[in-house]
Amino acid sequence: LGVAEKVNDHITVSVGPVLVPQTHPLATVINENNAVFVTGVAVGETMFYGPGAGELPTANSVLSDIISVTKNIVMGITGNSFNDYSHEIKLATPDEVKNPYYISLIVPDKTGEMLKLTELFTNVEASFKLITQTEANEGFAKISIVTHAMTEAQLLKIEEGLKQEKDVELLAAYKVLEKG
């Protein structure tokens, strides 16, 4: 999912896997369809939805655009800008960007492992919204966690802490989409 958001007076942009709740309009996008979900003060929430293109039509369109732009530059007919308004905006820092996260781990299935996780999260002031444990391979358990909203900086500290733990494997850490 590609996401761009204004955070305070900064902007955050990202592209990557995101868990989308079944209740979110983006969860209805299926197969080769694409969607753009926009939230704005004047329009509220809107979604533009339609068929996407396969790899060959997309490549053909991109190549055609590149050829047209190159040709226009060489001929000196690039035209005038529609709008030359500009406003400098800086990227948000990891301390400013907040999201809930889904974290999946494999841990030794023994006493004290859940306590270690709780201490790690407590040390970075992050909290669990949902946590489940299921059996994995012999002697190990799979822990699935959904956190309350926390910063990217907190997530990085959690990931660093997990790397220090013997026999703990981080399988995934994905944003969870909560708006919509």
Model-assigned labels for residue ranges:
Residues L1-T28, N33:
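Substrate-binding/catalytic subdomain of NAD(P)-dependent oxidoreductase enzymes
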Residues G2, S14, F37, M47-Y49, ...:
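Structured core elements
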Residues H10, I30-N33, A53, P57-S64, ...:
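Conserved active-site and cofactor/substrate-binding residues in soluble primary-metabolism enzymes
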Residues T12, P17, A35, E45, ...:
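Generic secondary-structure boundary/loop-capping signal
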Residues P25-N83, H87-P100:
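ATP-dependent carboxylate/acyl-activation modules
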Residues I66-G180:
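A conserved regulatory-domain signal marking ACT and ACT-like small-molecule sensing domains
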